Amino acid sequence: MIRKLLFVFVIAAIAIACSTNRITGRSQFKLLPEAELQQMAVAEYQSFLTSNKVVSSSNNRDAEMVNRVGQRIVNAVYNYYRQNNIANELEGYQWETKLIQSDQANAWCMPGGKIVVYTGLLPISQNEAGLANVMGHEVSHALFGHTNERMSQSIAAQYGGSILDAFMANRTSSGMRQIFGAAVGVGSQLGIMAFGRNQELEADRYGMIWAAMAGYNPQEAINLWNRMNAKAQGNNPPEFLSTHPGPERRIEQLQKHLPEAMKYYKPMSNK
C-alpha cells in the first residue's frame, strides 16, 4: 500500500513539474522553482567573479561593446515578452553582463540573467552582430529554463523511484548544489553545459530573433557558426562548441528559421 501511495505521489510530482513553454510550445520537465534556481545561480556567479579577472568597461572598448550588446539583447527580450503578454515571466531577473579575461572561446548566461563573455570568443564573433547572436543564444538557455530541465533530469535519474522523498529531503542540502554544479559546470568548466539537441536548436532560433529585434542582422548567425565550425576543425576547438550539435544540422536549422528572424530585423543606424 505504501509503495502504491509513493508511486501516486511520484506521478503527481512529475505531472506538476511538467509544463508547456509559452514561447516554444515544447513540454518541459522542471522540478525546481525558478526563484530557488536563481538564488543558486547568483551564489555560483559571485564565486566565479572572485576567482576570474573581470575586464572593466570604464576603459576598455571590448567590455563596452559587450555591455552595449548585452543591454540591447535584454531590451529586445523584454519587448518580445511584452508583445506576447508574458512579461511577468521575467520577474526576478537581475540582468548583468561581464567580460572575462580568458583565452577560452566561450559565453554563458545563468538562470536569472547573469551573462558572461570570455575575451577568447571575440576574435571568432568578430563584430557586434556576431556577438549579439552568441549572447542571444545563451540568454535563450536561461529564458527557457534549460538548466532547470537538466537538473530535473539529473534528479530523476539519481533518485529513481524515490524521486519525491529524496528530492524534497535534499533540495536544501549540499547535494542540491552538487546537482546544480553538474548542470551548469563549476570552476573552469562553468558554462560548458551539455544541453540537449532540442535545447540548442531552440537557443539558436530565438537567439536570432533577439539579435534581430536588437537591430543586428540575423544572417550573421550563419556566418558566426561557419566561423565556429571552421575553428572547430583545428587543434583548439572553441569550448563553446564542446556540447553542441553537428554543424550541418545547425546550419540547416538556422537557414530554416532565418526568414522568421528577418521579420523582426530593423537595422540600427551608425552601429
Predicted regions and their residues:
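A Zn2+-metalloprotease active-site environment signal
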Residues: 18-271
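Sec-dependent bacterial lipoprotein signal peptides
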Residues: 1-18
